[in-house]
């Protein structure tokens, strides 16, 4: 290996031989992509949390899981500006050791948390549709909150190792802040990156397939609302695959190259390393798109926007504010006045499932 390769690509990390690249293409492409994901993700998840915190007066287990999904997505999204800066500077971290560890930990923890709670939402929907009288459909808010805390504890436990690793790593004249390096050794972080995709993928696909099959067995898929619900379920699964599968496939390719070629010639990894970080940016897109799940999974969100738009139009026409009722009361008032609200969410948690739980409200 010549001196140019040694200086630019080869790096020893924790006594392991690694290949590290600082590609100019990443500087040009990824910051704008992350910028868009940050803007739309911040708006969508920020608005979702605002509705959860200030415009919902009644909580159910399903909403508690959705709230935790929104928290995970929001915490991931707010880390993206620091990652953008890291890319713009060509992997030259300028904020020191502790901020680097925190950023890597937050990205990993909340990516994993987002996947876990998205999976929990799918499982919750599965039991309400396929097993409407199962005991899991009757869990209290307290139990749902305890389950959420346990899941957060597991997520933190699986990613806390990133807080223990000294960062950044000296790479020539630059400070490398990255949790993904091409090293010829097994890493727990790498294994979890693969496991956190394949296990939830299997669960989400199983739940989605069983829900669709159950509805068709009952011949409910003939109704227009149920058809839209089935389409929505399929879209959620497809978006999950599109966002996470590419980076997993590329990472598996890197593992294969490490097994067959080692790290003697780092040039072998230039293209796959670039492909990995491009596809890794797709995973953050999932957190940007998750607010769509909130919108279609609970009647409160479409009802909130409908109420907000109607009020704005009313104020514009009359020129007088309407202070008679608060938005939060309208969201949690008489279920009979809630247009097209999914009954499984609006009713008590112990009541049987209604097919309208699955999909968007009627136009």
Curated annotation (Swiss-Prot):
Name under which the protein is recorded: Hydroxycarboxylic acid receptor 2
Residues with Phosphoserine modification: 328
Its membrane topology: Multi-pass membrane protein
Claim: rRNA-binding is one of the keywords in the record: no
Cytoplasmic membrane side: 55-63, 124-142, 214-229, 295-363
Superkingdom of origin: Eukaryota
Family statement: Belongs to the G-protein coupled receptor 1 family.
GO CC entries: cell junction; plasma membrane
Gene giving rise to this polypeptide: HCAR2
């Amino acid at each position: 290996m010549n001196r140019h390769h040694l200086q630019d690509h080869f790096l020893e990390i924790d006594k392991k031989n690694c290949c590290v690249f600082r590609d100019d293409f990443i500087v040009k492409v990824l910051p704008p992509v992350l910028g868009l994901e940050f803007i739309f993700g911040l708006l969508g998840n920020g608005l979702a949390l605002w509705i959860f915190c200030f415009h919902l007066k009644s909580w159910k287990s399903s909403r508690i899981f959705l709230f935790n999904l929104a928290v995970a997505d929001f915490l991931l999204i707010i880390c993206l500006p620091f990652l953008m800066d890291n890319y713009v500077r060509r992997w030259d971290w300028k904020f020191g050791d502790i901020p680097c560890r925190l950023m890597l930990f937050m990205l990993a923890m909340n990516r994993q948390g987002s996947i876990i709670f998205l999976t929990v939402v799918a499982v919750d929907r599965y039991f309400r549709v396929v097993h409407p009288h199962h005991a899991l459909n009757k869990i209290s808010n307290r139990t749902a909150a305890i389950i959420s805390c346990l899941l957060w504890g597991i997520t933190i436990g699986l990613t806390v190792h990133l807080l223990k690793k000294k960062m950044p790593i000296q790479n020539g004249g630059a400070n490398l802040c990255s949790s993904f390096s091409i090293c010829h050794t097994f890493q727990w972080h790498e294994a979890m990156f693969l496991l956190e995709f394949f296990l939830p993928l299997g669960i989400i696909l199983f739940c989605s397939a069983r829900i669709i099959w159950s509805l068709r067995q009952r011949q409910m898929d003939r109704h227009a609302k149920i058809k839209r619900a089935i389409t929505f379920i399929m879209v959620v699964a497809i978006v999950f695959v599109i966002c996470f599968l590419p980076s997993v496939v590329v990472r598996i390719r890197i593992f294969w190259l490490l097994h067959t070629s080692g790290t003697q010639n780092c040039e072998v990894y230039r293209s796959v390393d670039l492909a990995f970080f491009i596809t890794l940016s797709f995973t953050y897109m999932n957190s940007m798109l998750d607010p769509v799940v909130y919108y279609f999974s609970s009647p409160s969100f479409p009802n909130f926007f409908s109420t907000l738009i109607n009020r704005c139009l009313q104020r514009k026409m009359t020129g007088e504010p309407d202070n008679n009722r608060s938005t939060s009361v309208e969201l949690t008032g008489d279920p009979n006045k809630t247009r097209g609200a999914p009954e499984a969410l609006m009713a008590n948690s112990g009541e049987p499932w209604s097919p309208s739980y699955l999909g968007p409200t009627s136009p």
